[in-house]
């Protein structure tokens, strides 16, 4: 006999078994436990992801006599794979499938004579090792009369722990009455030696042995040429099927112990030929982690009890009676890539769901669920990285801290130190910092430049002196804004910053105590309202606060001295009851205007300037002029001009306002008496311009005439 070698390829066979008396075929093994079953048992073609299941077929009663000879023939412990071979018939076709599976195939066949029928059984061996391990099987031919059956014995040696063997068979059976198929799939371990491979071979006396050997030799040559092409290696990886979880579990158990373990189920599909050729695909790519089964033959009855039968149908081509390409369920193909990704995780075994008919169906849905479950795991590091970036951003944004500049400035009264400290501590630095940053952002949104440090960039907080804390929403102690227990706390940042990144903050606590004399110091000129209204204006208007803070000294002692001097000025001004604030302001403006003129003019303006010096601390221009010229009050000795000026001012009380269209700055900038003469005629020239508003003309006439009379009388008195 010529040994047959077959590399990386499995194939299916087309056979026509209608001839009964002339066909001689070998058989290796079959069991007689299920021989009493009827031929009417339906055979359905089913395939799992990595396993093949076959329901036990029924055999004729007359075949029981050959059971003893078959059992004696199967004592060899060699590693064998089963394949299908064909008996020469009228149109026997051999067609290789497009999926490579094995690297070597060696078998020798022997035949016996049969009287009326032919019973075919094929034995093949395969090995994944580079060295071609050959195995020989002992094939015997039983004598049957009316049935033609195929009994296939599959044996696969388990190689290294990282290799996996998955096998399947593609067979075809035809008969007039009922074909049957019995496939036993076993895998021995590597410990079986090649010495066991040699078994006794039964030589047949058939005349067609030579033709069969020629057929195998031609097949061997064609297969070796086909396997040399690299396309099969690519298909080896593409046409892979996902292994079931039960097979993975079985492979782990089989690796630990090479001893036989009959408790693990073997999945063998039952295939029905329907008088046509059918195909069962083999997944060679999954052969790296195949299930090494025990080196023993299991009875077909036991296989039927412990095998799950997934429903996967293969297609056949009845016209050509040839094997089609392997067809599996589309879900199985789609999940092939999913199982490859999930192999290293070694998921727990998922038990297949039982059918109403008692069969089990292994579905690939758990693979899809596992993929979906693995998606959030990949997103977890992304979330943690995002949280880290969010945590680091605010730390980079806030690079400066606040530092209170002590002592706190208190205006409008006296407050104990403990109360002031409680008020300051009631407002956290973070809230102040947020409020200041908001104001900067609002100004940028409006298109305004960054505000300079001062009252324009400040935050105000209402404070209750009774609670000694800032008022967030409401306070029961306060009845309104004018309540003496209510105060306003101003927090103003200063431009100086330390090396530590801290910004000094000036804290000013303004008390709303209207009856205090110090409140009159903040009264602006040309204001007819009382001190209470002025305090409300200070609380609401930041521009007023800016003017006030220009005169705040750096230390508390200087501030107290400034308050004392201002109180003295107020006491001096309160003694002159005949002169009100309105003529004082006009007299003060006249003094500033004529300060660069003749000394006579300064002597006349001297007494009035001394009385109006209390208001010189309001604007920067007035304070500079009063400080720069302290000499005019010294030559005031003659009291004669005082009643004249008082007499004149008494007349001009009702006409103290400037004419419309002229500003205080323009009036102050005039330095000589020529400007006064020039201003006598402009009202006449301005009449046609202001004719559209009669009210303005009337007011302008009255105001200009009053001022002209005032200046004329004053100059006449000076000349005299």
From Swiss-Prot:
InterPro entries: CSNKA2IP (IPR038954). Residues 227-249 have a biased composition (Polar residues). Residues 630-640 have a biased composition (Pro residues). Keywords: Nucleus, Phosphoprotein. Expressed exclusively in testis (at protein level). Within testis, expressed mainly in the intermediate compartment of the seminiferous tubules with weaker expression in the basal and adluminal compartments. Phosphorylated by CK2 (casein kinase II), specifically by complexes containing catalytic subunit CSNK2A2. The keyword Oxidoreductase does not apply. GO terms for cellular component: male germ cell nucleus. This is Casein kinase II subunit alpha'-interacting protein. It comes from Mus musculus. The gene is Csnk2a2ip.
């Amino acid at each position: 006999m010529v040994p047959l070698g077959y590399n990386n390829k499995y194939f299916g066979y087309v056979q026509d078994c209608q001839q009964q008396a002339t066909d001689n075929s070998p058989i290796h093994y079959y069991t007689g436990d299920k021989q009493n079953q009827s031929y009417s048992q339906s055979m359905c073609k089913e395939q799992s992801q990595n396993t093949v299941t076959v329901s036990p077929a029924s055999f004729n009663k007359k075949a029981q006599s050959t059971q003893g000879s078959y059992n004696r023939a199967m004592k060899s412990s060699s590693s064998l794979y089963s394949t299908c071979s064909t008996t020469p018939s009228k149109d026997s076709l051999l067609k290789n499938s497009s999926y490579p599976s094995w690297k070597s195939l060696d078998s020798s066949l022997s035949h016996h004579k049969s009287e009326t029928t032919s019973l075919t059984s094929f034995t093949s061996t395969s090995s994944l090792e580079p060295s071609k391990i050959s195995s020989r099987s002992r094939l015997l031919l039983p004598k049957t009369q009316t049935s033609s059956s195929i009994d296939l014995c599959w044996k696969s040696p388990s190689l290294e722990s990282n290799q996996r063997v998955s096998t399947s068979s593609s067979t075809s059976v035809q008969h007039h009455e009922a074909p049957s198929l019995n496939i036993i799939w076993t895998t021995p371990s590597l410990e079986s030696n090649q010495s066991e491979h040699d078994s006794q071979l039964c030589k047949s006396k058939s005349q067609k042995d030579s033709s069969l050997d020629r057929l195998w030799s031609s097949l061997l040559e064609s297969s070796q040429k086909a396997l040399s092409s690299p396309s099969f290696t690519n298909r080896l990886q593409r046409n892979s099927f996902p292994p079931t979880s039960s097979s993975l579990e079985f492979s782990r158990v089989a690796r630990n112990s090479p001893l036989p373990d009959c408790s693990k189920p073997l999945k063998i599909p039952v295939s029905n030929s329907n008088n046509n050729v059918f195909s069962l695909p083999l997944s060679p790519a999954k052969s790296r982690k195949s299930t090494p089964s025990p080196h023993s033959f299991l009875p077909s009855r036991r296989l039927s009890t412990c095998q799950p039968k997934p429903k996967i149908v293969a297609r056949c081509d009845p016209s050509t009676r040839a094997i089609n390409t392997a067809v599996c369920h589309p879900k199985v193909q789609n999940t092939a890539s999913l199982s490859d990704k999930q192999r290293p995780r070694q998921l727990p075994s998922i038990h297949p769901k039982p059918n109403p008919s008692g069969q089990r169906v292994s579905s690939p849905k758990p693979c899809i669920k596992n993929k979906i479950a693995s998606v959030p795991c990949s997103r977890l590091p992304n979330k943690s990285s995002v949280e880290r970036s969010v945590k680091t951003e605010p730390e980079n944004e806030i690079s400066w801290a606040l530092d209170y500049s002590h002592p706190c400035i208190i205006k409008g009264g006296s407050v104990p130190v403990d109360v002031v400290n409680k008020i300051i501590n009631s407002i956290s630095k973070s809230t102040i910092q947020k409020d200041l940053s908001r104001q900067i952002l609002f100004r940028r949104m409006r298109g305004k430049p960054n505000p300079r440090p001062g009252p324009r960039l400040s935050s105000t907080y209402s404070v209750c002196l009774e609670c000694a804390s800032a008022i967030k929403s409401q306070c029961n102690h306060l009845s309104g804004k004018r309540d003496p227990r209510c105060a306003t706390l101003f927090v103003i940042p200063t431009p100086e910053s330390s090396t530590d990144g801290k910004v000094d903050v000036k804290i000013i606590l303004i008390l709303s105590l209207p009856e205090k004399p110090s409140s009159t110091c903040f009264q602006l000129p040309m204001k007819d309202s009382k001190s209470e209204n002025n305090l409300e204006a200070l609380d609401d208007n930041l521009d007023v606060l800016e003017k006030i803070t220009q005169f705040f000294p750096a230390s508390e002692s200087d501030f107290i001295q400034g308050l004392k001097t201002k109180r003295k000025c107020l006491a001096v001004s309160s003694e002159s009851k005949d002169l009100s604030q309105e003529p004082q302001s006009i007299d003060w403006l006249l003094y500033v205007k004529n300060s660069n003129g003749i000394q006579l003019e300064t002597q006349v303006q001297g007494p009035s300037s001394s009385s109006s010096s209390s208001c010189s601390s309001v604007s920067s221009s007035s304070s500079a002029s009063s400080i720069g010229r302290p000499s005019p009050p010294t030559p005031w000795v003659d009291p004669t001009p005082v009643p004249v000026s008082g007499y004149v001012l008494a007349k001009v009380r009702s006409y103290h306002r400037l004419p419309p269209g002229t500003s205080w700055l323009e009036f102050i900038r005039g330095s000589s008496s020529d400007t006064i003469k020039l201003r006598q005629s402009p009202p006449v020239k301005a009449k046609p311009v202001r004719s559209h508003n009669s009210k303005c003309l009337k007011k302008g006439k009255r105001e200009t005439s009053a001022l002209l009379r005032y200046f004329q009388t004053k100059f006449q008195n000076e000349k005299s």
